[in-house]
């Protein structure tokens, strides 16, 4: 079930008893993702939990959050990396953190889905692998022939079985996403 859409590419969904927040794709490296996802998950919890329930004496049971970012940008990036909100905190003395637990933490798993990153997730998820292949096709097409149309690239992808069913159904949406 989709609970909340932050932007057209951001999504939050319930899976079993967990709240999984996905940023479907990030084409630029953004070390502020933990902060942004903290904001997103706060909004999701606001929608899930009635106001009156938040003020009851007994603790609420909340869906467990997991945070993922799919990176498909051009800059070099490891196959997987964990970003931590606490890395952004201004702490007067580093030794303070050793003695005291951090009161607020968000861990974001950034997964590089570029074909050349050779991430194992692509072997396990055909759709994601095809998406990554499509992104690579678009890049190659722009580099080889800047005048070639996006339409030609999408037609080539469909002919090669790359997200063909999806591209046939949603070609205008995909075109708009790739142009943005």
List each model region and its residues.
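Elongated, amphipathic alpha-helical interaction scaffolds
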Residues: 1-180
């Amino acid at each position: 079930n989709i609970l909340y859409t932050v932007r057209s590419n951001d999504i939050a969904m319930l899976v079993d008893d967990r709240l999984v927040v996905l940023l479907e794709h990030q084409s630029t490296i953004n070390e502020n993702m933990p902060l942004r996802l903290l904001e997103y998950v706060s909004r999701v919890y606001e929608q899930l939990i009635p106001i009156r329930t938040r003020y009851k004496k007994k603790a609420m049971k909340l869906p467990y959050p997991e945070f993922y970012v799919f990176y498909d940008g051009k800059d070099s990036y490891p196959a997987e990396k964990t970003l931590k909100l606490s890395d952004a905190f201004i702490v007067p003395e580093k030794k303070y953190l050793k003695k005291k637990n951090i009161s607020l933490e968000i861990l974001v798993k950034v997964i590089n889905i570029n074909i050349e990153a050779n991430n194992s997730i692509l072997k396990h998820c055909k759709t994601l692998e095809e998406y990554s292949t499509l992104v690579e096709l678009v890049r190659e097409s722009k580099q080889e022939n800047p005048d070639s149309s996006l339409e030609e690239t999408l037609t080539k992808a469909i002919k090669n079985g790359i997200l063909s069913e999806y591209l046939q159904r949603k070609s205008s949406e995909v075109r708009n996403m790739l142009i943005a």
